[in-house]
A protein has these predicted regions:
Chain B
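Short, Lys/Arg-enriched, disordered terminal segments
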Residues: 1-4, 250
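ABC family nucleotide-binding domain
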Residues: 3-226
Length: 225, 250, 292
């Protein structure tokens, strides 16, 4: 009897397990993104500093993060912290730490370039109207920066969602791992399960990420008009 | 004749990092209600001078006095003083993320903490006067250059400044839009607004100015009433400069 | 080389990492203070008993040794043993927390004391013995040779001057090229390519771990594993952190005492036989009492 691959999805609670796995991925990405945005805003402002030493350390941080594979960072924080510092972090906490560490650097660089792309006249008009430095940033520069940042922020978030598939290596079971478990559990009975399971994961990713990028596009359009 | 002196500079000096002297011992005074036009070739220091008056740029030495107060850029009251000295720039410097009304209301509400409904009414009156009452809820990018500059003037006026600094506000405009902006400035002058204007529009300068300052290489070369200056300039440099605006028929 | 890089970068990363997210960095209470050492101190047998549960690292996608069934429950040969450990330690087979590990990080899980025992199809090698302590084996693997029923290879001498398919980098490749130069080898990068080649008749037989070919032959009619065990015998054993002697000795005692009831034969019947069928001899895989 021919066993159809798609049946595997409806065995037991496989389908639900996939959604739970996706929820784990999303949760990690969204929490990390939240911290990355907050810290990245500050880091981006620090990056525009004219102090050469400050700029050097910002650059060093950014380049370090870019050179180091996220996997190495995950291992360092998850296993390294336990071995060397006796800090036993859960896989989820370690993942949020690493993704925030990475996201803050990337976000900071985006914020820096957005800040630098705002003409100097915008600052001067603000000062000429009697605003102080904080007021100029709060009412004039940051609102404009956020608008410019929206597309690249969305991009970073989706990259983060995709990168969450690495966290399985520190024991966090997310959607791709659940998929592998389902495929493997039935590898003797349903050899072509992989195609179906990965296909469904693809659609699930799309179903979740598409509204995000759609919302960002709409918001961007609304802000432009 | 007892006219109040409102702004005064003494021996302002400023050099760029490369050593180029951009302001050289400028001593200047402005009376209440007076309109002073500063003209001169590009790079003569006139825009820098204007920005120093508003403390957007520091000076190397010299003092700036607003009424009886000496202005120090490092001092906190600089933010308060800037509200009394409004400024409009050459480039369209409206805030692109805010509607016209919000552009105008931002500083009065956030800086001066005035009631939004009260300032909104004032803003609408002013917009009506400059012929833009139908534009309150649109965004800057939907306006022409001339319309944007009129809004920028309204935005500066909303702070109730005692002096208005206009830095080549028509230099980036298409010729057909220059007039609509300058007309607004002429009206302000008629109403007694104290202004320091940097411009390349000679006809306008002649019409609006109480006094003309001619600057070259960081120095005030010549000073006088518009009639004196435009009809019989005293210095060779001023004559040469004015000749550039003059074309002989063949 | 890689380890040096990791240690060198650790300082920077941790400092910056903690800085970047210090709000969430909560050091768990009760982590005993101790001097810096290359590994975190594993829980002793007493500490595990006091805690009331044991943490065992298993695979979650290596059917039939450790896998998650369609109801989300962990199953398999290793898991079956893990539950028995919990039962004999605490009186209940639910007193075990299974941690899902990956092949590449099994050693790290022990070194960082995130698990007490690894039961993840962990093959005993000399290299690994330097990093972890292995208890007595509970399973053994060798190579198997699968071939078509029409021209079944049941002895290695039949392979002379014939073509044997192997996957690059496996023990099968090493074994046959060193010990049987008379056999022609056809090498592939991927298992799937190798199986396809066998099905197409590009080779006379295919060899890799016997557990792998046995399971494949069950699902593919017309093919049989004619040689179920050949080559060097590898053993599979539980592993604990290096120096965790009490726990190691307890595990050894457990494995010895389970021989009396032939526990691993029972384990085989429950978890492996459904996959391998009843035609093969369990003695080729199962080890009782640590006696290979």
């Amino acid at each position: 009897m021919q066993n159809l691959g798609i049946q595997i999805l409806f065995q037991g609670n496989n389908f639900l397990r996939l959604w739970v796995g996706l929820w784990v991925s999303l949760k990690l990405a969204v929490i990390s993104m939240f911290f990355s945005i907050c810290l990245g805003m500050l880091f981006g402002m620090v990056m525009t500093s004219t102090n050469k030493l400050v700029r050097f350390f910002c650059r060093l941080y950014l380049e370090t993060v870019r050179i180091m594979p996220q996997l190495v960072l995950l291992f360092l924080v998850y296993f390294g912290a336990a071995k060397h510092l006796n800090v036993n972090l859960s896989g989820g906490t370690a993942a949020v730490l690493v993704f925030t560490f990475w996201g803050t650097a990337e976000m900071g660089d985006l914020v820096r370039s957005a800040l630098e792309s705002i003409p100097v006249h915008q600052y001067q008009s603000g000062y000429a109207l009697g605003f102080g430095k904080i007021g100029v940033y709060r009412h004039i520069i940051i609102p404009q920066t956020i608008r410019r940042l929206l597309p690249s922020m969305m991009n970073l978030l989706t990259r983060m969602v995709k990168t969450t598939s690495l966290v399985v290596l520190i024991g966090v079971i997310e959607v791709v791992k659940v998929g592998k478990q389902i495929i493997d559990a039935s590898r003797y009975t349903v050899p072509d399960a992989a195609l179906w399971v990965y296909g469904v994961i693809f659609i699930m990713y799309f179903a979740v990420c598409y509204p995000f990028s759609r919302a960002a596009a709409l918001l961007d359009k609304k802000l432009r008009d | 004749m007892n006219v109040e002196e409102i702004l005064k500079t003494e021996q302002l000096n400023k050099s760029y990092e490369n050593g180029l002297k951009v302001l050289n011992d400028i001593t200047f005074s402005l009376k209440k209600g007076e309109v002073v036009v500063i003209i001169g070739p590009s790079g003569c220091g006139k825009s820098t001078f204007l920005r120093c008056l508003n403390m957007l740029e520091p000076v190397d030495s010299g003092t700036i006095r607003f009424k009886d107060r000496v202005i120090d850029r490092a001092n906190k009251d600089v933010y308060e003083l800037r509200q009394k000295i409004g400024m409009v720039f050459q480039s369209y410097d409206l805030f692109p993320h805010l509607t016209i009304l919000d552009n105008i209301l931002l500083a009065p509400v956030k800086v001066q903490k005035r009631e939004r409904s009260e300032v909104a009414k004032e803003a609408e009156d002013l917009l009506k006067r400059v012929g833009l009452s139908d534009k309150t809820n649109v965004y800057p990018r939907q306006l022409s250059g001339g319309q944007k500059q009129r809004v920028a003037i309204v935005r500066a006026l909303m702070m109730h400044p005692e002096i208005l600094l206009l830095d080549e506000i028509t230099a980036a405009l298409d010729p057909e839009m220059v007039r609509e902006v300058l007309q607004v400035v002429l009206e302000l002058a008629r109403e007694g607004m104290t202004m320091v204007i940097v411009t390349h529009e000679m006809e306008f300068a002649r019409a609006v100015a109480d006094r003309v300052l001619f600057m070259d290489q960081g120095v005030v070369v010549e000073e006088g009433s518009p009639e004196e200056f435009f009809n019989s300039p005293q210095t060779e440099r001023a004559k040469q400069f004015l000749n550039m605006f003059h074309y002989e028929a063949r | 080389m890689k380890k040096g890089l990791l240690s060198a970068l650790l300082g920077i990363t941790m400092a910056a990492g903690l800085l970047a997210g210090c709000s969430q960095a909560k050091a768990p209470a009760g982590a005993p203070a101790q001097e810096a050492s290359p590994s975190a101190k594993a829980r002793s047998l007493d500490e595990i008993k006091k805690a009331g549960t044991i943490r065992i690292g298993v695979f979650s996608d290596k059917n039939p040794f450790g896998y998650v069934d369609s109801n989300g429950k962990i199953q398999g040969y290793d898991v079956y043993f893990g539950k028995r450990i919990a039962k004999d330690l605490f009186g209940s087979e639910d007193k075990v927390e299974f941690v899902y590990v990956e092949a590449a990080s099994r050693v790290e899980y022990l070194k960082s004391a995130k698990v007490d025992v690894i039961l993840a199809n962990f093959t005993v090698t000399n290299e690994r013995k330097e990093q972890v302590d292995f208890a007595l084996p509970y399973m053994k693997v060798a190579l198997g040779v699968v071939s078509p029923d029409k021209a079944l290879i049941s002895d290695v001498s039949q392979l002379k001057d014939k073509t044997l398919i192997v996957v690059k980098g496996t023990t099968a490749e090493t074994y046959f090229s060193q010990n049987h130069p008379e056999i022609k080898l056809l090498k592939f990068d991927e298992y799937q390519e190798a199986y396809d080649a066998l099905a197409d008749g590009r080779g006379d037989a295919f060899s890799t771990d016997n557990t792998e070919v046995l399971a494949w032959a069950i699902q593919n009619k017309g093919f049989t594993v004619g040689i179920e065990s050949i080559g060097n015998l590898d053993t599979i054993a539980p592993a604990v952190q290096k120096g965790n002697t009490e726990l190691l000795e307890w595990l050894n005692g457990e494995i010895k005492s389970l021989a009396g009831e032939q526990f691993f034969h029972q384990d085989y019947k429950e978890t492996l036989e459904p996959v391998y069928g009843d035609e093969i001899d369990p003695e080729n895989l199962v080890v009782e009492g640590g006696q290979v």
